[in-house]
Amino acid sequence: MADYKIHLLSEDEGIDVTFDCSEDTYILDAAEEAGIELPYSCRAGACSTCAGKVTEGSVDQSDQSFLDDEQLLKGYVLTCIAYPESDCTILTHVEQELY
């Protein structure tokens, strides 16, 4: 089983951290295990509270039902149901960009 480095960034929130996440662990769950507080609500991929934007790397978020195709193409991700497929850099706290 592969482990990946997840780099989270948010200039507004003062976040610049990197942690390990296995390929079978949701990014939000791994962040919490590493002591990083991120916003969330449903934990089921049905809202946008936990939205991030992948700027490097790739994720599997096939369980999500909220983001549309255009948002997915732009790199938006729901961290509560996203598994890493590689090392990733993700901008956090981007929910407002979706609207």
UniProtKB/Swiss-Prot annotation:
Protein name: Ferredoxin
Compartments, as annotated in UniProt: Plastid, Chloroplast
Gene3D superfamilies to which the protein is assigned, alphabetical: 3.10.20.30
Organism: Porphyra purpurea (Red seaweed)
NCBIfam families: fdx_plant
List of residues binding [2Fe-2S] cluster: C42, C47, C50, C80
Ranges of residues in domain 2Fe-2S ferredoxin-type: 4-96
One GO cellular component term noted in the UniProt record for this chain: chloroplast
Gene Ontology MF annotations: 2 iron, 2 sulfur cluster binding; electron transfer activity; metal ion binding
Keywords in alphabetical order: 2Fe-2S, Chloroplast, Electron transport, Iron, Iron-sulfur, Metal-binding, Plastid, Transport
Gene behind this protein: petF
Pfam families reported for this sequence: Fer2
UniProt cofactor(s): [2Fe-2S] cluster
Coarse class of the protein's main subcellular location: plastid
GO biological process: electron transport chain
Co-factor note (free text): Binds 1 [2Fe-2S] cluster.
Record note on quaternary structure: Forms a complex with heterodimeric ferredoxin-thioredoxin reductase (FTR) and thioredoxin.
Physiological role: Ferredoxins are iron-sulfur proteins that transfer electrons in a wide variety of metabolic reactions.
Keyword field contains Iron: yes
Domain of life: Eukaryota
Protein family membership: Belongs to the 2Fe2S plant-type ferredoxin family.
